[in-house]
């Protein structure tokens, strides 16, 4: 799932790290996800339903809404559900949380 998330995000935002980014970029994404067994057969899960969060961070003066729109479209194109978006920013930076679901079949 991590590779799918990074592949969807990095054409829009070049830096995408799992959980925590400690680099120098002013614009970046982090992501996390939980797995829930799904698609049962022969008494076992044959797929995982993944609850995904992609966090987009950028400076206050950055035109973030267009990037958030492009991230939403990129996640949809990678077969995630259409993400909900929460503005979690504060007075130091813009922070948007995109939440969606995906299926990991392997």
State where each predicted segment sits.
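Oligomerization/assembly interface segments of phage tail-like spikes and tubes
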Residues: 46-62, 94-103
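Sterically constrained small-residue positions within well-ordered secondary structures
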Residues: 22, 45, 89-91
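Small/polar-rich, solvent-exposed N-terminal microdomains that initiate assembly or binding
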Residues: 1-41, 59, 67
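Glycine-rich loops and low-complexity Gly/Arg-rich segments
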Residues: 42-43, 54-58, 78-82
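Acidic-leaning, charged glycine-interspersed low-complexity segments
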Residues: 68-106
């Amino acid at each position: 799932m991590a590779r799918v998330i990074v592949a969807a995000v990095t054409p829009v935002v070049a830096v995408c790290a799992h959980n925590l980014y400690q680099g120098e970029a002013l614009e970046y994404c982090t992501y996390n996800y939980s797995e829930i067994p799904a698609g049962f057969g022969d008494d076992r899960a044959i797929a995982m339903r993944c609850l995904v969060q992609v966090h987009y961070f950028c400076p206050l003066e950055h035109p973030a809404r267009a990037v958030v729109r492009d991230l939403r479209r990129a996640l949809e194109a990678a077969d995630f559900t259409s993400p909900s978006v929460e503005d979690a920013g504060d007075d130091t930076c813009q922070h948007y949380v995109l939440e969606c679901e995906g299926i990991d079949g392997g």
